Structure formats: structure tokens, C-alpha cells
Design a protein with these regions (language model features):
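Catalytic-core regions of core metabolic enzymes
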Residues: 1-311, 315
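Residue-level recognition of specific faces of alpha-helices
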Residues: 50, 103, 328-329, 339-342
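Internal amphipathic alpha-helical segments of the cytochrome P450 catalytic fold
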Residues: 180, 234, 326-327, 337, ...
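Primarily a LysM-type cell-wall glycan-binding module
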Residues: 312-339
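Short acidic, glycine/serine/threonine-rich helix-capping segments at coil-helix boundaries
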Residues: 342-351
């Protein structure tokens, strides 16, 4: 990707995470609907910008004036959340393009992940966006939040149960919205807060690397946690991992699609090409990232990195109970190339 394209993508990420005005297409009084719950969360956490509910069949939504279209608002809109059925997304994109929207967050599904017909519609939406200079997060995602802007467009039960966004130093970037929600719930149980969290879904436009690069440059983010199904630009991804290591920001990764069956599941989930796991593992470890097995370990390690100083090297002692734990520890730590110094001047203590 050319530097000018990367710069444009990073500007779009910054706009998405710190918008001045948001339109909610599909806004509803019903909290069981996406347009209802996400509008409620925007208000609940005290977003300081302008919020415009868009619903042509209502005058008021959640006590706020509703607009028949984005164009009818007549004011600049940075981000438009599209929470309408798939068959209405093309008209919604044309409306946003005519209104000069900068970034679209599309939570609607049934696009490239569902087959050729959905992929063709996704391509048409991307063409509309490119003609208008709009950028897309999604589709088939669950949204995002930025705790330091008190702004949430993430549909999550963990957020619905909390009175505030817990500010923290972990940037969470996930292709899976469901796993992002599960990690968020577990992290909140541990008292771990996030700088920002984003669910990317199909990555039709903005992708993992764009948000990873933003996290490296973001003063609020000290630890970066990733759930990755497929990477669009492998060379850029590995280069960013090296940059994160040089910046002193640990990158923790859960990688889906480790087996052939897992790769098929990934394709049907977010239309990602998972790639061969061993090659991925070798490259990311060499670049300084930490691969973990599941989202519970990802949250636990992120919590540890925010609370403990980074080690200065690979040498370090391990304390454990006698027996199996002590004999298994060297094998477990060998995968991360931890070296155990031999103890000196040690004497058994009589019992």
C-alpha cells in the first residue's frame, strides 16, 4: 500500500474513533434492535458530539428528533452507523455519499461471508464509498468504542451492564464481534480497561493493519491485543509488529484457522483467507509478537502487561510447587525462548 493510502486510512481511523457527529440509520426505540441499543449506548456514556437518529417512519426516537435521511440533517456527519436490513444498504450508502459522510460503520451481515451474491453487493457498496471518498468499517461486525472519547458504537452486553466505559491502556482489535464482546466481559471482571476496541468483520475496506498502526501511535494504548482470522497485507502486518516492538508496546495475538477445518470456518465467518498457520506463527514470533491460545489467555496476558514492567531480557527465574509443575515448566517456557539461569550457592533447608 502506498504511503498516501496508508495516511488516508489512518486519518479515517482517527475520525471514526473521535467523531464530532454521528448519524444512526435504523434508529429505533426498541433496545433489542441494533439501531436502538447502539443509540442508547451513545447517550448512556455521554458522547459529547452531535447524534442524529435517522428513521423515515418516526418523528422522535428515544426522545430525540428523528431525521428522514442523512441528507435531511443538513449538518456535517463524520460517522454513519448503518443498522438497516441488507436489501436497504445500497440506498443507505447513496444517502450517506450525497451527505458527505466520512466513515460508515456497517453492522449488517450477509455479504462476502455468505457467498457470491453477498460478495457482489459488498463490492457495489465499496464502489459507492470509493466514489464519494467514504471509508467503511465492516460489514458483518459489531462496532467499536473509544473510552477516552466516551463514545461507544459497540453492541455488547458487557457495555449494557456497565454504567461507564472503563478507561485503560489495552487496544483490542478483533475480526470477531462475538469474541470481542466475550473478551470485554472477561476483562471487565478482572478490572482491565481498554483505550479502544474495534470489531472489523469482513474488512471490506479499513482492516486490522490500519487499527494496529493507530494503536502503535496512540498515546492511550500501551498493550495491543489482536484476534486475527486473516491478514490482507502480510508484509505490512509483520512490519507493524516490528514497529510495535521498537515502541515498547507488546502485541498479543490469537490466530484463528490453525487447521484446515478451522480455515473453512473462518471463510464462512468473515470471508477471510486464514493462510497456513505455521508460516504465520514463524513470522509473527520473529517480529516480536506473542501468540496465545485463546481469548481467556489473551485477556490474562493483557492484564499482566498493563500491571507489570516489561522484562529486560529472556533470563528469569520461575517459582512453582514441587513435582509435575516444576518438571513441566521448562517445556512450557521453551516455546517463548525463556532462559533459566542456574542457581548458585543454593543449599537445602532442613525441615
Amino acid at each position: 500500500m502506498a504511503p498516501v493510502e496508508i495516511a488516508a486510512s489512518l486519518q479515517a481511523v482517527r475520525t471514526a474513533l473521535d467523531p464530532r457527529a454521528i448519524a444512526v440509520l435504523g434508529a429505533s426505540d426498541e433496545l433489542t434492535k441494533w439501531g436502538g441499543s447502539m443509540l442508547a449506548l451513545l447517550r448512556k456514556f455521554g458522547f459529547r458530539g452531535a447524534v442524529y437518529p435517522v428513521n423515515p417512519r418516526a418523528d422522535l426516537v428515544q426522545g430525540m428528533k428523528a431525521w428522514p435521511s442523512v441528507q435531511a440533517i443538513g449538518q456535517p456527519v463524520d460517522v454513519a452507523l448503518i443498522a438497516v436490513p441488507q436489501q436497504r444498504t445500497e440506498a443507505a450508502f447513496e444517502d450517506c455519499a450525497a451527505a458527505g459522510v466520512k466513515v460508515i460503520l456497517m453492522v449488517t451481515s450477509q455479504f462476502a461471508e455468505s457467498g457470491a451474491e453477498g460478495a457482489a453487493l459488498q463490492d457495489r457498496l465499496l464502489a459507492i464509498a470509493r466514489r464519494a471518498g467514504m471509508r467503511i468499517i465492516g460489514p458483518n461486525c459489531m462496532g467499536y468504542f473509544n473510552s477516552h472519547a466516551d463514545m461507544s458504537l459497540l453492541n455488547s452486553q458487557a457495555l449494557m451492564r456497565n454504567d461507564r466505559l472503563i478507561k485503560g491502556e489495552v487496544a483490542l482489535i478483533s475480526q470477531s464481534g462475538a469474541l470481542a464482546g466475550a473478551m470485554l466481559a472477561r476483562a471487565y471482571d478482572l478490572g482491565v480497561g481498554f483505550s479502544f476496541c474495534v470489531s472489523l468483520g469482513n474488512q471490506a475496506d479499513l482492516e486490522v493493519c490500519d487499527f494496529l498502526e493507530h494503536a502503535i501511535d496512540d498515546a492511550h494504548s500501551r498493550v495491543i491485543a489482536l484476534y486475527v482470522e486473516g491478514v490482507k497485507d502480510g508484509a505490512r502486518f509483520v512490519d507493524l509488529l516490528r514497529r510495535a516492538r521498537a515502541a515498547g508496546k507488546p502485541v498479543l495475538i490469537v490466530k484463528a484457522g490453525r487447521t484446515a477445518l478451522g480455515q473453512q470456518a473462518v471463510q464462512s465467518h468473515t470471508a477471510s483467507l486464514a493462510g497456513e498457520f505455521r508460516a504465520f506463527e514463524s513470522q509473527v514470533r520473529h517480529a516480536g509478537a506473542v501468540l496465545v491460545d485463546d481469548f481467556l489467555e489473551l485477556v490474562a496476558q493483557a492484564a499482566a502487561w498493563t500491571r507489570l514492567p516489561a522484562p529486560s531480557g529472556r533470563r528469569g527465574p520461575t517459582w512453582c510447587a514441587p513435582g509435575t509443575r516444576s518438571t513441566a515448566s521448562p517445556s512450557c517456557t521453551a516455546s517463548i525462548r525463556l532462559r533459566w539461569p542456574r542457581p548458585t550457592n543454593c543449599h537445602p533447608r532442613p525441615r
